[in-house]
Amino acid sequence: MSLTNEQIVDAIAEKSLMEVMELVKAIEDKFGVSAAAPVAAAAAAGPAAVVEEQTEFTVVLTNPGLNKVTAIKAVRGVTGLGLKEAKDLTEAGGILKEGVSKDEAEKIKKEMTEAGATVEVK
């Protein structure tokens, strides 16, 4: 029995954010690929290529710190997730926000650091 693409998309749409993140990680591991956009490959295409300054950043939670409750509240404030999703993301670590400006990334980093968490801006 073979699933159609529509059935696969519908099944993914029913999953929570954490389940989808776990699915992406499993696909990356199984097939040896990365879900990250290949931005650097275009810039390194030739010597005449102009190096562009990064305009979009990703904020990644690397460590929630000692006070998880404060970190969960901060994650909820930053992401707009519900309590359970924010708790799961805080405990597992991972991407808080993608495609944000440098100013917003720094604001998120400051807010999370004040909550005792460690974040990385990529």
Swiss-Prot record:
Disulfide bonds: none annotated. It comes from the Bacteria. Pfam families: Ribosomal_L12, Ribosomal_L12_N. GO terms for biological process: translation. Signal peptide: none annotated. SUPFAM superfamilies: ClpS-like, Ribosomal protein L7/12, oligomerisation (N-terminal) domain. Keywords: Ribonucleoprotein, Ribosomal protein. Coiled coil: none annotated. GO terms for cellular component: cytosolic large ribosomal subunit. GO terms for molecular function: mRNA binding; structural constituent of ribosome. PANTHER family: 39S RIBOSOMAL PROTEIN L12, LARGE RIBOSOMAL SUBUNIT PROTEIN BL12M. Belongs to the bacterial ribosomal protein bL12 family. Homodimer. Part of the ribosomal stalk of the 50S ribosomal subunit. Forms a multimeric L10(L12)X complex, where L10 forms an elongated spine to which 2 to 4 L12 dimers bind in a sequential fashion. Binds GTP-bound translation factors. Forms part of the ribosomal stalk which helps the ribosome interact with GTP-bound translation factors. Is thus essential for accurate translation. This is Large ribosomal subunit protein bL12. It comes from Xanthomonas oryzae pv. oryzae (strain KACC10331 / KXO85). The lineage of its organism: Bacteria, Pseudomonadati, Pseudomonadota, Gammaproteobacteria, Lysobacterales. The gene is rplL.
